[in-house]
Regions:
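Soluble extramembrane domains flanking the early transmembrane region of eukaryotic membrane proteins
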Residues: 2-6, 18-220
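Extended, basic/acidic-rich, low-complexity regulatory helices/tails in eukaryotic proteins
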Residues: 11-17
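Hydrophobic alpha-helical transmembrane segments corresponding to the first two to three helices
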Residues: 208-332, 338-339
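Structural signal for hydrophobic/aromatic residues that build the beta-strand cores
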Residues: 187-191, 242, 313, 383
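Residue-level marker of positions within ordered structural domains that often coincide
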Residues: 112, 194, 247, 318, ...
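Generic detector of multi-pass transmembrane helix bundles and their immediately adjacent loops
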Residues: 286-530
Length: 530
């Protein structure tokens, strides 16, 4: 009897997860990829992998159906539903077919922990997904079908569905049905055929994936409540900030107007994300309008935040009235960051994106990561110069607030680097997305971190009756730009009139000094005589 060794993983799983790991390695801010719960297939073709032809149909974390689920209301039950799945093969593939011929196309659903049950080999040889003639002769499987073994945890899984081309049929249909989910896990769907004669086969239709609480994928479901919490947090911050703003509106600085704008953008972003997730949960499809505005408000907020932190680090509005020649460079950097981030976020969030990130996304991630790094370097370089000048002029109040600001940024950068290291560890040890229930923490953390930094900045620069002491004052003692230009100005020739005036002034000062000295010496002599 032949010994059938289980395959550790199907080839497409290894390939795409490797791409996902590279994506997280290159991404400094990180986010998990997103799947829509309604997966549509529109003329998609199969890819050869080993001795099989494969199409990835979806991958989502699903929770088990709740006991006594209310099927009428659609709440409590968890399933994968196949709707109007049709396969069409090209006419040339049936030229040599006989009326008695039959060819299978199979859909296989398995939980990620059961991946070793897919595929096998005879006598420990090369693993294959489709049954080989040698295995068929030994009775281990049926030639032309996918090799799989029942799961040790759930004998009814993997679930395998089949559609058959009979004779010269050009179209076949996969029966519409629901696959109930009775065990919590990360489920994968693959469409597979083994006969090379079906080369050029295309698929049409859709599958619907549902959790007990709605259509949100399992690893995204906690984010809906998270964005609701963040919306409340921004409201609380907004109440504090706007109350201070109204009380001391006569003392408000331009910088504080910018912070007001960022807080308002944050409120809008969190509210739109919450409603986007709520709509997604109800319908299984992302609402394009809400998603677009959520992404745009978020991108504008991040761009404005970067620019504000940069110009504050340069001392704008506090120790210098303008940015001078740097204005155009700051605007150009901000505009480039906005464009790169907006494209990346729209690609990640608009529509159905596979759990396994494509290579094309790397080209969108790299510019954003490089721009982030450039912002950080420029910010800390500018802060160092500003702190040195404040310390040299002994501007204690401004120096104190800038030191606190620098410390807050430094802590944020250190925590960010630490979290990136954790992301790398998390993804490298979760190649098959087995820890999907905790994946939502990664994007949530970045939101919490940015909100925390915003709270610190709001506390440091909150409007108050003393706000004007942090404003730029044109008294000559703080004009950094003017001081920098002094060393570049060459003294001009002095006229004879000016020279005489200067000499006279120096003589007068010397006379006063001598009189004072004489008087002082006289007092000393008088004291001695007494």
């Amino acid at each position: 009897m032949a010994r059938v060794d289980p395959a550790i993983a199907a080839p497409p799983l290894r390939l795409h997860n490797h791409d996902g790991f590279l994506f997280f390695f290159l991404l400094l801010l990180l986010f998990s990829s997103v799947d829509a719960s309604v997966h549509s297939y529109i003329g998609e073709k199969f890819t050869p992998k080993g001795n099989a032809f494969i199409l990835h149909g979806g991958s989502e974390g699903l929770y088990a159906s709740l006991p006594h689920a209310n099927a009428t209301a659609g709440r409590g039950d968890s399933f994968i539903r196949f709707e109007k799945i049709t396969f069409t093969r090209p006419e040339k593939s049936v030229e040599n077919s006989k009326d008695t011929d039959s060819v299978l196309v199979q859909a296989i659903i398995f939980e990620v922990e059961d991946r070793e049950t897919i595929g096998g080999s005879a006598y420990g040889g090369q693993r294959a997904i489709c049954c080989t003639p040698d295995l068929a002769k030994l009775g281990a499987c049926t030639q032309g079908t996918v090799i799989y073994r029942p799961s040790t945890q759930n004998p009814k899984w993997p679930q395998v569905l089949a559609a058959t081309f009979n004779g010269k049929d050009l179209v076949t249909t996969l029966p519409s049905q629901n696959i109930p989910i009775t065990r919590t896990g990360m489920f994968n769907l693959y469409f597979i055929y083994c006969d090379p004669a079906l080369n050029g086969l295309v698929i049409e239709g859709k599958t619907v994936w549902k959790n007990p609480t709605g259509y949100l994928p399992g690893r995204m479901a906690p984010l809906m409540n998270f964005y609701g919490f963040m919306s409340l947090a921004f409201v609380i911050l907004g109440i504090f900030w706007f109350s201070q703003y109204v009380r001391f509106w006569r003392e408000v600085l331009p910088l504080q107007n910018c912070i007001t704008f960022v807080i308002a953008l944050g409120m809008l972003e969190m509210a739109f994300w919450y409603f986007e997730y709520a709509e997604f949960n109800d319908t299984g499809l992302r609402p394009m309008g809400i998603t677009f505005w959520a992404v745009t408000f978020g991108t504008v907020k991040r761009t404005v935040s970067w620019v504000i932190i940069l110009v504050v680090s340069m001392g704008y509005g506090v120790v210098r009235p303008t940015l001078g020649g740097l204005t155009s460079k700051v605007i150009m950097l901000g505009a480039t960051f906005f464009l790169a981030s907006e494209i990346l976020e729209l690609v990640e969030n608009a529509g159905a994106v596979s759990d396994f990130a494509g290579k094309a996304r790397l080209f969108l991630v790299l510019p954003v990561a490089l721009l982030d790094a450039f912002f950080i370097i420029w910010i800390f370089t500018s802060l160092s110069k500003t702190l040195d000048k404040l310390q040299a002029r002994r501007l204690i109040a401004k120096l104190d607030i800038y030191r606190k600001f620098t410390n807050a940024l430094a802590v944020t950068v250190v925590v960010s680097v630490g979290w990136i290291c954790y992301e790398l560890y998390f993804k490298s040890n979760d190649v098959y997305n087995g820890h999907w229930q905790n994946a939502w923490i990664i994007p949530a953390f970045w939101q919490v971190l940015s909100f925390s930094l915003l709270c610190v900045i709001a506390a440091l620069w909150a409007p108050s009756q003393n706000s004007m002491r942090y404003a730029y004052s044109d008294d000559g003692s703080e004009d950094f730009d003017r001081e920098d230009s002094f060393s570049l100005i060459k003294p001009g020739p002095v006229s004879s009139k000016d020279a005489r005036g200067s000499a006279g002034l120096m003589d007068a000062r010397a006379a006063v000094s001598n009189d004072t000295t004489t008087s002082h010496d006289g007092d000393i002599e008088e004291d001695k005589r007494e």
